[in-house]
C-alpha cells in the first residue's frame, strides 16, 4: 500500500510521461508515480460513480475496479454517461466497462458484478483506496473499520436530487506535501531600515512543505453527541446537509433503497417521519431540517453528480498522490444554493 511519501519506486515509461505530461507539470513526477502505483475500488456505478470513475481513469491510477451488482434501468442510467442507451437489463459495472476503458487504455479497468456485502474482509486489502457510493451506513462503517487497520484510504459519497456529499477517512496520521511560496530572509545590513530587514515572500519561488493531519472514522463522524454544550454552541454554523445525510442513510437502512420519484407521496411522508425520529434521537429540533427538503432529494441529477464527483475524484487523487491539503472530513454540496462547504465532524 502507498502509505508514505517516500514510497516512489513506480517507474513512469516514456509513453506514460507523454500521456500525463500536463499532470506531471501540474503536481510533479513523484505525485504521478504514486498515482501510477495505486489501485482503487469504486463501489456503485450510477451517476456519481461514473463521474468518479472518469476522473480517476483520466488521472492515471494503476488500476480501477468497478463493483456493482445491480441491473441497468431507464432510471439508473439517466445520469450515467458510461452506460449505452441500449444496455437496459445489463449489469451496471459490465455495461460501463467499455467506455471507461476507452478513456485511458493505460489504466487496468475491471468490472465486478458481485454484491459488495458478500465480499470477505481480505477482498478490500488489495486496494490503496476504496470509494463507496450507494452503500448502507452499516456497510460503510464496516469497510471503513477494516481499511483503517491496513492504512487504506476510504471515501464515501452520494447524490440525492439537488444535494450531495463526500466523506474521507485518511487515517490517524496522513502525510502530504504542500507547495508554499518561499520566504526570503531580510537584509542584515546595519544601514538598512526596518522594512528591508523583514522576511519577504518571493512570488517566483516555492518550497515543498511536509505536513501531517489526522482523520476520524466514519462511525465517529456520524455519532456526534449534540447534547454537549460545545456541540450545541456550534449548531448555528452546521450545514443542514449533515442532518439530511443522517435522514437519508436511515431511509436507506429501513427501506433497502433510496427515495423514488414513482413513490414520491409515500416516500415524502416517510422522510418527514424519519427526520423527526432521527433529530429527536439526537436531542435536536426538527426545525433544523425544514419540511421543504423532501422536494429536492429524489434521484440523481447530472449537474450535481458532476460537481460532487469532481470533488470526490479530486480528493482521491490528492490522497493517493499525497499532494496538497485534503478536505477534512465532509464536503456537502447544495445545488439550490449553488454552493459547497467543507466541515469536520467527530464524536471525540
UniProtKB/Swiss-Prot annotation:
Pathway membership? Protein modification; protein sumoylation
Q: Which UniProt keywords apply?
A: Ligase, Nucleus, Ubl conjugation pathway
Organism encoding this protein = Danio rerio (Zebrafish)
Write down the PANTHER family for this protein, in alphabetical order. SUMO-ACTIVATING ENZYME SUBUNIT 1 (PTHR10953:SF162), UBIQUITIN-ACTIVATING ENZYME E1 (PTHR10953)
Asked if the keyword Ligase belongs to this entry, the reply reads yes
Q: Which family does it belong to?
A: Belongs to the ubiquitin-activating E1 family.
- Tell me the Gene Ontology biological-process terms attached to this UniProt entry: definitive hemopoiesis; hematopoietic stem cell homeostasis; protein sumoylation
**InterPro entries linked to this entry:** ThiF/MoeB/HesA, ThiF_NAD_FAD-bd, Ubiquitin-activating_enz, UBQ/SUMO-activ_enz_E1-like
Q: Name one GO molecular function term.
A: SUMO activating enzyme activity
Protein name as it appears in the record: SUMO-activating enzyme subunit 1
Location comes to: Nucleus
Q: Which Pfam families match?
A: ThiF (PF00899)
Q: What does this protein do?
A: The heterodimer acts as an E1 ligase for sumo1, sumo2, and sumo3. It mediates ATP-dependent activation of sumo proteins followed by formation of a thioester bond between a sumo protein and a conserved active site cysteine residue on uba2/sae2.
Q: Name one GO cellular component term.
A: cytoplasm
Q: How does it assemble?
A: Heterodimer of sae1 and uba2/sae2. The heterodimer corresponds to the two domains that are encoded on a single polypeptide chain in ubiquitin-activating enzyme E1. Interacts with ube2i.
Amino acid at each position: 500500500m502507498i502509505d508514505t511519501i517516500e514510497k516512489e519506486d513506480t517507474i513512469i515509461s516514456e509513453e506514460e510521461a507523454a500521456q500525463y505530461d500536463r499532470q506531471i507539470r501540474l503536481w510533479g513526477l513523484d505525485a504521478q508515480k504514486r498515482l501510477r502505483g495505486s489501485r482503487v475500488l469504486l463501489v456503485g456505478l450510477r451517476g456519481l460513480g461514473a463521474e468518479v470513475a472518469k476522473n480517476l481513469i483520466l488521472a492515471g491510477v494503476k488500476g480501477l475496479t468497478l463493483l456493482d451488482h445491480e441491473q441497468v434501468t431507464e432510471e439508473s442510467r439517466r445520469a450515467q454517461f458510461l452506460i449505452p442507451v441500449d444496455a437496459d437489463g445489463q449489469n451496471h459495472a459490465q455495461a460501463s466497462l467499455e467506455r471507461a476503458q476507452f478513456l485511458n487504455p493505460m489504466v487496468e479497468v475491471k468490472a465486478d458484478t458481485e454484491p459488495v456485502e458478500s465480499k470477505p474482509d481480505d477482498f478490500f486489502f488489495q486496494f490503496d483506496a476504496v470509494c463507496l457510493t450507494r452503500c448502507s451506513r452499516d456497510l460503510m462503517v464496516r469497510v471503513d473499520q477494516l481499511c483503517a487497520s491496513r492504512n487504506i484510504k476510504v471515501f464515501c459519497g452520494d447524490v440525492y436530487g439537488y444535494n450531495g456529499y463526500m466523506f474521507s477517512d485518511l487515517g490517524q496520521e496522513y502525510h502530504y506535501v504542500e507547495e508554499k511560496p518561499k520566504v526570503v530572509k531580510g537584509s542584515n545590513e546595519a544601514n538598512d531600515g526596518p522594512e528591508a530587514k523583514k522576511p519577504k515572500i518571493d512570488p517566483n519561488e516555492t518550497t515543498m512543505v511536509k505536513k501531517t493531519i489526522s482523520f476520524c472514522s466514519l462511525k465517529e463522524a456520524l455519532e456526534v453527541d449534540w447534547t454537549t454544550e460545545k456541540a450545541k454552541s456550534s449548531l448555528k454554523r452546521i450545514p443542514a446537509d449533515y442532518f439530511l445525510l443522517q435522514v437519508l442513510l436511515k431511509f436507506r437502512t429501513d427501506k433497502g433503497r433510496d427515495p423514488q420519484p414513482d413513490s414520491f407521496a409515500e416516500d415524502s411522508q416517510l422522510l418527514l417521519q424519519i427526520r423527526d425520529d432521527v433529530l429527536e434521537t439526537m436531542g435536536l429540533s426538527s426545525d433544523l431540517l425544514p419540511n421543504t427538503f423532501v422536494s429536492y432529494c429524489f434521484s440523481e441529477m447530472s449537474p450535481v453528480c458532476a460537481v460532487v464527483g469532481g470533488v470526490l475524484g479530486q480528493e482521491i487523487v490528492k490522497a493517493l498522490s499525497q499532494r496538497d491539503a485534503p478536505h477534512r472530513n465532509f464536503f456537502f454540496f447544495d445545488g439550490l444554493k449553488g454552493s459547497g462547504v467543507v466541515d469536520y465532524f467527530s464524536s471525540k
